Amino acid sequence: MGTESGIRNMTAGSPFRHILMFTLPLLAGNFLQQFYNMVDSWVVGNFVSDGALAAVGVGFPVIFLFTSLFSGIATGGTVVIAQSFGGGRPDRVRSAIDSLYTAFIRSILPITAAALLLVNPLMTVLRVDPAAWAETRTYLLVVCAGLVGSIGYNLNAGILGGMGNSSTTLLFLAVSTILNIFLDLALVLAVPLGVLGVALGTVIAQLCSWLFGIWYINRRYPQLAIHPFNGIFDRKLFCEIIRIGLPSGIQMSLVALGAMGVLSKVNSYGKAFTAGFNVGNKLDTLSFLPVQSLAAAVISFVGQNMGASREDRVRQGVRITVTMAVVWTVLSSAFVVWLSVPLSRIFSPDPAVIAASVRYLQCVMPPYVLFAILFVLNSAMRGAGDSLYPMVNVVASVILLRVPFLYLLANRFGPDAMYWSYGIGWAVACVLSVYHYAAGKWRGKYRSE
């Protein structure tokens, strides 16, 4: 089967073609988002201050912490919807959508309030440079107040992803990105609001993208219509979504805490080092986007085929996806390291910032292929309904290995040595994930009822 109005049935036909065609719109959307992030960093770094650039960089893991729980639940929704669609259960798809949005509407205000209250304590834990404190606080307060748009967008994307539709998600991202860039330029250059303008632009764009997404889905896909305030909540089905999605959300939250632990150490070396770290992080994230897109594709592919009882296609699809991820990561890592100086110079003319960014890339990019394998295999296991093991594996590698080793190496050998901890954590986690997948321990996790 192929596609109908963007909805893709991946239980028959070429796995390579399905995965590739699902990945391409996601990849385009992710590049759009990163293009905005680069424009954002370019505007802030060149027209505001290094303090503002550090503020935006520090803000990312904090915002990720607050959105990660619902992002995980959205992943659980993607898996349940994919399995239900692959198994020919449109009634179950409908119930999953209603249950997801009912839970979202009931919990968004408490989540937002908690985020606002935790801004100052988290900044203290992160040891934000006093020179960047005011700008960081402004950025975080504004973006936390607008979490509804970011979380709502993730829910819409999760619903469509389960149905094999990534092209419509690209449309939503395009709306957000174009509006975000326009607002960035208007509120920073035309109206000099500084980091406040950047934060307002982000919140307004995300909110508009979410609301546009609801309108578009309801108009184009009536069978998936979203009813935020009058959907029927299916407690049993939502528990299945939570079973799959909560470990993923907890994993992302704890990884965000681990990232804040890293930032706490990074921030202790001053504004220039922090800004350089953030520039390097943006560049490595950009090179990793295809793997993230492939991982999202394999979740939907595995979910649909588990629902259709096609485990043979699951294994075939995973092999194809891992191969594509490895080839891309090796090539992109070499390219980014080779051009690390001119790429870093795009974001800041400061030699100290450039030096910190280059060193980050030289240490982190070579072992990235291990993370690519780990990322795809964990996503495949989530698609099969096994999300507890990936959570334990990744959390152990980050919290128990990366962060302690980072502090140990930095204290013993200096700030550049902290980056070696990335490869150590990825190597251990990758070996464990390969073993878990090869042993078939993810099988039997799918529940059709």
For the regions a language model picked out, list residue spans one by one.
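Short alpha-helical transmembrane segments in multi-pass integral membrane proteins
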Residues: 1-23, 81-148, 190-246, 302-367, ...
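N-terminal transmembrane alpha-helices
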Residues: 10-47, 61-76, 80, 105-112, ...
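Transmembrane helical elements of multi-pass membrane transporters/channels
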Residues: 21-40, 142, 176, 205-209, ...
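Transmembrane alpha-helix boundary and packing residues in multipass membrane permease domains
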Residues: 26, 30, 42, 79, ...
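Helix-terminus/linker motif at the lipid-water interface of multi-pass membrane proteins
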Residues: 35-53, 123-130, 186-193, 253-282, ...
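Small-residue-rich hydrophobic transmembrane alpha-helices
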Residues: 53-113, 150-169, 263, 277-340, ...
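Hydrophobic transmembrane alpha-helices of multi-pass small-molecule transporters
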Residues: 65-68, 180-184, 210-214, 286-289, ...
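Short runs within selected transmembrane alpha-helices of multi-pass transporters and secretion channels
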Residues: 74, 142-161, 169-177, 198-211, ...
